[in-house]
């Protein structure tokens, strides 16, 4: 037991061992046990909790960084409970959380933090994590090439176009922001992983169930029990992913919260707007963005400035609401696509569960049939035993020790045996006729 504790617990610092030895060698004058020394620096180093993270930026560049928990919390503006979702030592259900500056994704093996500029994953040797990183880099590189091509075509169309409408129509390329592309790869990886597990379970289940219907054995029943346990666990995981996607699709506020690029642009725009200094007055007119003094300005100018500010604020709010609606529609279409995929996987597992239930019902019917046959055979044996008991009664009566003249006749034994046999046969046939009439036995 002591050896196991030494292997599990971290090694003691040398300073603590030295202090303990010194304290043990010098007893206290009051007779009390001396206080043991504590290596504060060693505790501080162990308390930092540096973890290795894989960072993927918008340019598809990846690097390994070592960051502690508190630095990561400040960097992504996340609470500690969200970081616990990413810890591989704990088992949490699938979750997608939209925060102020990040999206926390916990989908099967894919556990990452998505921001507007980067994706952070715990450094792991899991193949699914490495495949996610490679697939994300390929998607980002492909999207960057597409954006360059769209910009070139946009510049060419601007040069050739003569109207302003054509320029406005071609000035907004249709592509997903960085966080949605990273979320899409995570959803695709999770859905593909769950669908592959469901397919493997189907390949293993259907032949086993078909064999079980024809041959019921202890080995096949044990395999079917294990298969059903795996099916229930996989169905629970698929159902959780489906419910999480459906919950996001039903809540427009959560979907709007996940649009990190737009929030970052608005924040930067507000900062730039606060830092800019407007020109207040020219020679004979005033600027619309200049503050109007209530003393020096006439009432007409104040009313005009107030009406213009109201119109401008309404226009900005309407434009932001339209952008939010469009962004929600983009994310909703993305989630809806993978909702269909995960719902198809769930339907596949549901069909397999129904097939298992049908097989169980068929096996129960077979067992009931065998049980009924055994009961019928037992009833037949009981009837035959009753008929044989009649012979025992006759033998007991004639076996009594008293004088009868019937015993002295030479053909008496044959007559007794024949009459008893005929009576027993009649009784047995009467029982069979009764069983057939009551449909207790198929005869």
Curated annotation (Swiss-Prot):
PANTHER family with a match to the protein in the record: MAGNESIUM TRANSPORTER MRS2-10, RNA SPLICING PROTEIN MRS2, MITOCHONDRIAL
A Pfam short name: MRS2-like
Gene3D superfamilies: 2.40.128.330, Magnesium transport protein CorA, transmembrane region
Region (Disordered) residue spans: 1-33
GO molecular function term, any single one: magnesium ion transmembrane transporter activity
Membrane topology: Multi-pass membrane protein
UniProt key word rRNA-binding: no
Residue window of motif Required for magnesium transport activity: 399-401
UniProt function note: High-affinity magnesium transporter that mediates the influx of magnesium. Involved in tolerance to Aluminum.
Keyword Transmembrane helix: yes
GO cellular-component term (any): plasma membrane
Gene: MRS2-10
Keywords: Cell membrane, Ion transport, Magnesium, Membrane, Transmembrane, Transmembrane helix, Transport
Expression tissues: Expressed in the whole plant.
TM regions (residue ranges): 379-399, 415-435
Subcellular location(s) of the protein: Cell membrane
Record's miscellaneous remark: Has the ability to complement mutants in Salmonella enterica and yeast lacking magnesium transport capability.
Protein name per UniProt: Magnesium transporter MRS2-10
Record-stated family: Belongs to the CorA metal ion transporter (MIT) (TC 1.A.35.5) family.
């Amino acid at each position: 037991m002591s050896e196991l504790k030494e292997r599990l617990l971290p090694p003691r610092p040398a300073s603590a061992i030295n202090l303990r030895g010194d304290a043990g060698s010098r007893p206290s004058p009051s007779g009390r046990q001396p206080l043991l020394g504590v290596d504060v620096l060693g505790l501080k180093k162990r308390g930092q909790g540096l973890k290795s993270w894989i960072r993927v930026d918008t340019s598809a560049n990846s690097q390994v960084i070592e960051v502690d928990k508190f630095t990561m919390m400040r960097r992504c503006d996340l609470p500690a409970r969200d970081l616990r979702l990413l810890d591989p030592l704990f088992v949490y259900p699938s979750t997608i959380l939209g925060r102020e500056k990040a999206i926390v994704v916990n989908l099967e093996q894919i556990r990452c933090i998505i921001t507007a500029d980067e994706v952070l994953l715990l450094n792991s040797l899991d193949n699914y994590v490495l495949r996610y990183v490679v697939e994300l880099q390929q998607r980002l590189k492909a999207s960057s090439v597409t954006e360059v091509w769209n910009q070139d075509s946009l510049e060419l169309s601007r040069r050739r176009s003569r109207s302003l409408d054509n320029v406005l129509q071609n000035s907004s390329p249709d592509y997903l922001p960085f966080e949605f592309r990273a979320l899409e790869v995570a959803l695709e990886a999770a859905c593909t992983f769950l669908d592959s597990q469901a397919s493997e379970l189907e390949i293993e289940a259907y032949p086993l169930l078909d064999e079980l219907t024809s041959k019921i054995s202890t080995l096949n029943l044990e395999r079917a029990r294990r298969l059903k346990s795996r099916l229930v666990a996989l169905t629970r995981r698929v159902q959780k992913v489906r419910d999480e996607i459906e919950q996001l699709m039903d809540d427009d506020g959560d979907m709007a919260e996940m649009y990190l690029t737009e929030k970052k642009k608005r924040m930067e725009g507000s900062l730039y707007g606060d830092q800019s200094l407007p020109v207040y007055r020219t020679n004979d007119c005033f600027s619309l963005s200049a503050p109007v003094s209530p003393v020096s300005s006439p009432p007409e100018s104040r009313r005009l400035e107030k009406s213009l500010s109201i119109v401008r604020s309404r226009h900005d709010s309407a434009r932001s609401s339209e952008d939010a609606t469009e962004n929600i529609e983009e994310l909703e279409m993305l989630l809806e696509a993978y909702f269909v995929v995960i719902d198809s996987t769930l339907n596949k597992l549901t069909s397999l569960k129904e097939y298992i239930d049908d097989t169980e019902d068929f096996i129960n019917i077979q067992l009931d049939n065998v049980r009924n046959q055994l009961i019928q055979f037992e009833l037949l044996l009981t009837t035959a035993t009753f008929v044989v008991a009649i012979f025992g009664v006759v033998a007991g009566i004639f076996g009594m020790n008293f004088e009868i003249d019937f015993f002295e006749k030479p053909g008496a034994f044959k007559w007794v045996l024949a009459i008893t046999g005929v009576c027993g046969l009649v009784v047995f046939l009467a029982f069979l006729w009764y069983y057939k009439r009551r449909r207790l036995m198929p005869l």
